[in-house]
C-alpha cells in the first residue's frame, strides 16, 4: 500500500486529486494535509508549542503522517527558498516529494528543487492517469520528469 499526501494551495484541485487517487487499488490517500492557506497541516491538532518555525511544524506533521509520496505545490517555495524541501529530504527520507507545477514554472526553479531532494515534477492540471503513474514510478525509486526536463538536467550535469 502506497500512502500519498497532497499539499496543494488550491483546495478544489487538491480534493479532485485526492478523490481520483483514492479510487485506485494499492493507494491510500492521507487527506486534510493542508487545510489552511499555504501551510501543510494534518487534521489532528498539535499541542501548541512556542519557538517552533513553520518548517519544523510541517516536518513534524509529515513525520507523523509518514506518506510515501508527497505532492507539494511548487508555489510553496517562494523566491527559490527550498528550506522546507531540504528539511523534508533530510528528516523524512522515507517521504518522496513530487512537485506540482504549472506552465509559469521556470526550468531552473524545477532543477533547483530536484537538486534539493524532489523526486519529480508534474503539471498540476495533468490528467489523473499521470498522477497515478507518477505515484507508481516514484514509489519504485525512479524519478518523474518530462523528457524535455530530463534533457535539461543532463545538460546541467554534462556542462
Model features per residue range: what roles?
Residues 80, 106-109:
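Alpha4-beta5-alpha5 switch/output surface of CheY-like receiver
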Residues 94-105:
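A short, hydrophobic beta-strand element within the central beta-sheet of small alpha/beta folds
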Residues 63-65, 88-94, 116:
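Conserved phosphotransfer cores of two-component systems
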Residues 109-115, 120-159:
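Short, flexible helix-to-coil linker/hinge segments that flank and couple to helix-turn-helix
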Residues 70, 97, 121-122:
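Two-component signal transduction core modules
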Residues 39-59, 65-88:
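Conserved phosphotransfer microenvironments
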Residues 2-13, 17-21, 31-32, 39-42, ...:
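Conserved acidic segment of CheY-like receiver
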Amino acid at each position: 500500500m502506497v500512502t500519498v499526501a497532497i499539499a496543494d494551495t488550491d483546495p478544489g484541485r487538491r480534493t479532485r486529486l485526492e478523490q481520483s487517487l483514492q479510487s485506485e487499488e494499492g493507494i491510500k490517500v492521507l487527506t486534510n494535509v493542508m487545510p489552511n492557506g499555504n501551510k501543510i497541516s494534518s487534521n489532528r491538532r498539535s499541542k501548541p508549542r512556542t519557538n517552533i518555525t513553520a518548517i519544523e511544524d510541517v516536518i513534524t506533521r509529515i513525520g507523523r503522517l509518514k506518506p510515501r509520496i508527497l505532492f507539494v505545490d511548487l508555489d510553496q517555495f517562494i523566491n527559490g527558498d527550498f528550506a522546507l524541501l531540504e528539511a523534508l529530504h533530510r528528516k523524512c527520507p522515507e517521504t518522496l516529494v513530487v512537485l506540482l507545477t504549472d506552465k509559469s514554472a521556470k526550468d531552473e526553479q524545477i532543477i533547483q528543487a530536484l537538486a534539493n531532494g524532489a523526486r519529480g515534477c508534474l503539471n498540476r492540471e495533468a490528467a489523473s492517469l499521470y498522477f497515478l503513474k507518477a505515484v507508481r514510478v516514484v514509489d519504485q525509486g525512479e524519478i518523474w520528469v518530462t523528457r524535455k526536463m530530463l534533457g535539461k538536467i543532463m545538460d546541467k550535469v554534462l556542462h
